[in-house]
A protein has these predicted regions:
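Canonical positions in the second alpha-helix
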Residues: 10, 43-44, 77-78
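Structural marker of alpha-solenoid helical repeat scaffolds
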Residues: 13, 47, 80-84
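Canonical tetratricopeptide repeat
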Residues: 23, 57, 91-95
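Terminal, low-structured helical/coil segments at or just beyond the last alpha-helical repeat
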Residues: 72-106
Length: 106
């Protein structure tokens, strides 16, 4: 709770701090508050379009929702910006294949 408050306060004083939005998204992820997590990830990417971690987290949310077309689009964007998280692309692609196969068999 203290961390969340500090990041929220930082946003009040520095509304363009993408890292605060990212860390809030992580906190909301732990709290399983997907709506707030998504909102903060989108703000992070608005302020810092090349933020790999936010993009990866957003892809995970869309995979969970079975929003495969969005996952494909986000993965293309992720491919173009990745530096540190490039190894995660194969993981995303495998999860997408598995989810699509599972949905097709239902």
């Amino acid at each position: 709770e203290v961390s969340k408050f500090l990041f929220q306060r930082n946003i009040v004083f520095n509304p363009k701090d993408a890292k605060s939005y990212l860390y809030l998204a992580k906190i909301y992820n732990l709290e399983e508050n997907e709506k707030e997590e998504l909102k903060n990830l989108e703000t992070t990417l608005l302020l810092d379009p090349k933020n790999e971690e936010a993009m990866y987290m957003l892809i995970q949310i869309e995979l969970k929702k079975s929003n495969f077309s969005e996952v494909k689009d986000l993965t293309k964007r992720f491919n173009s910006i990745c530096l540190k998280f490039c190894k995660k692309i194969k993981d995303i692609e495998q999860k997408l294949k598995d989810a699509q196969a599972k949905e097709a068999s239902n």
